[in-house]
Amino acid sequence: MAFGTTAAGTITKEQTLLSIRRLPVAASTNIAKGNVLEQDAGGDLIVSPVGRTAEVNHYVALEAVDNSSGADGALHVPVAVAGHFVTVVADGAIRPGTAVVISGSTAGQVIAYVASSHAKNQVVGIYWGKEGGIVAKAAGSPYLESFTDAADFSPADAADGDVIEVQLVD
């Protein structure tokens, strides 16, 4: 059984020269921790849509914020910015070292960049690895369990639904 304890929306490597930002949330927007975000035309954050907006800065929500019934800018959300190593949710298979773009089917999640399908100016970051380990349970009595730790975000292939570490580049 695969095991991971780090939630999406967690900064995994402290960057002393980078700081998080608190940006306003657009009206009628519900943001989950770990969603990839971008600014709308008014400068308020929205969950990055499946349409993949080109040439925009991307952020990752570090907290959940529900502005479903609020006005533009009524609430703010702390976000990771370009340069941060942060966790997000994969929406498909991704190999380590691969650039990632917004998923075409799930807003706020990422998939592998494919040159024939995506523009370079849609890249959000680079996938480096995922946390986890293996829990093994003995087949017979006394049913001992062991855990092999891989908590340092080892460079393993990601699958749909995995919480993965990306370095934001845009």
Report each predicted region and the residues it spans.
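Glycine-anchored, exposed beta-strand/edge motif detector
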Residues: 2-170
